[in-house]
Amino acid sequence: MKNFMDENFLLQTETAQKLYHEHAAKMPIIDYHCHLIPQMVADDYKFKSLTEIWLGGDHYKWRAMRTNGVDERYCTGKDTTDWEKFEKWAETVPYTFRNPLYHWTHLELKTAFGIDKILSPKTAREIYDECNEKLAQPEYSARGMMRRYHVEVVCTTDDPIDSLEYHIQTRESGFEIKMLPTWRPDKAMAVEVPADFRAYVEKLSAVSGVTISNFDDMIAALRKRHDFFAEQGCRLSDHGIEEFYAEDYTDAEIKAIFNKVYGGAELTKEEILKFKSAMLVIFGEMDWEKGWTQQFHYGAIRNNNTKMFKLLGPDTGFDSIGEFTTAKAMSKFLDRLNVNGKLTKTILYNLNPCANEVIATMLGNFQDGSIAGKIQFGSGWWFLDQKDGMEKQMNALSVLGLLSRFVGMLTDSRSFLSYPRHEYFRRTLCNLVGRDVENGEIPVSEMDRVNQMIEDISYNNAKNFFKF
């Protein structure tokens, strides 16, 4: 029987162990997609308690706690103390066997705080106090955590109207770790609620200095902000979409749709889809002009619980995997850009694992030889960001594409304690490849190439792909 979470955690063969310890573990972290709050990095934020850094905003843990019968006040309530919230999490942890939260929890305790104890009601107070003592030390600040995990680059997620003042402040402070913005223009195509769209466009006008009275004006304002993001080091865009949009439309139609929604009138479903289709193409062309990588996270059904959405707002643990038939639209969208010679580097992230092979085969349709792995299958996202999901994603990519050109892992997290997910991924990767070597499916004579592949997927591919 193996010990829990020892140095060979998840590494089931000798080859896997060598691959991880001698090659994957030493590589720095490039976290090219996350949701860290830039101000916390700029201010080198000092965390007040383990609850704040660990439970604050963590909807993964909140979902588990609710499922375990914990009252909402201990998840998001304002009338409970940090200790009371942590105590309820500690009571939940023993019920999370086989859930990735159990592994993440103990990996984070071990790598961040040097704690090997199992979190339970019996150990909760001891662990809480020990972690809080360490969090009071300078090396456990926001920047300290990034240094601790050998982070080299982080890319935050930012709206076109964001000032990026904290990115600028961080860079000018001389902080050695790069914090770069990512262009996330979802609100610029969110035309479902006319009043919200108009309010956003008015903010865009104010920030860009462009008077907006028609569609062309809005695009001019967005281009100006796109240029500003590029000046601040942006290399990627990101789009959170339910499904891909690829309706047929004319320029005249899109201009008329803008006038209608900007004037306060509700759009038909067809008009909404046409507008989103046009905007995705325009954003794709902008990214191509600058050599950026466009990312698409698709397939989530968000805010399912109306009661809790009204109470807590979005991103609080009430989203789930959707079931959308989107392969044809995805193909049509990518083809539109490709036909015009404006398909930039692209990463596709699915939330429904049923689409793994759909994406893995879609990649090959649009690889053009200009760069290795130009169209990428993104690492297991959200509900798939765990051992089983990672293995399925990498297996599909291996069978139908080139695993060796994969740009690897990202945290997609709001937490400064999420960097061990890179270790979790690397261990899973090494175990997967190591097993093939041990089974005689990869020749031992090619170990130098295998070793290089592990280092590339862990770090080198991302560094070269994004030109950091």
From Swiss-Prot:
Enzyme Commission number(s) from the entry: 5.3.1.12
Keywords associated with the record: Isomerase
One BP annotation, GO: D-glucuronate catabolic process
Keyword Isomerase found: yes
Pathway: Carbohydrate metabolism; pentose and glucuronate interconversion
InterPro entries: Metal_Hydrolase, Uronate_isomerase
Primary enzyme class: isomerase
Pfam families membership: UxaC
One MF term in the entry's GO annotations: glucuronate isomerase activity
Reactions catalysed, as given in the entry: D-glucuronate = D-fructuronate; aldehydo-D-galacturonate = keto-D-tagaturonate
Recorded family membership: Belongs to the metallo-dependent hydrolases superfamily. Uronate isomerase family.
The protein's name in its UniProt record: Uronate isomerase
Annotated source species: Bacteroides thetaiotaomicron (strain ATCC 29148 / DSM 2079 / JCM 5827 / CCUG 10774 / NCTC 10582 / VPI-5482 / E50)
Phylogenetic classification of the source organism: Bacteria, Pseudomonadati, Bacteroidota, Bacteroidia, Bacteroidales
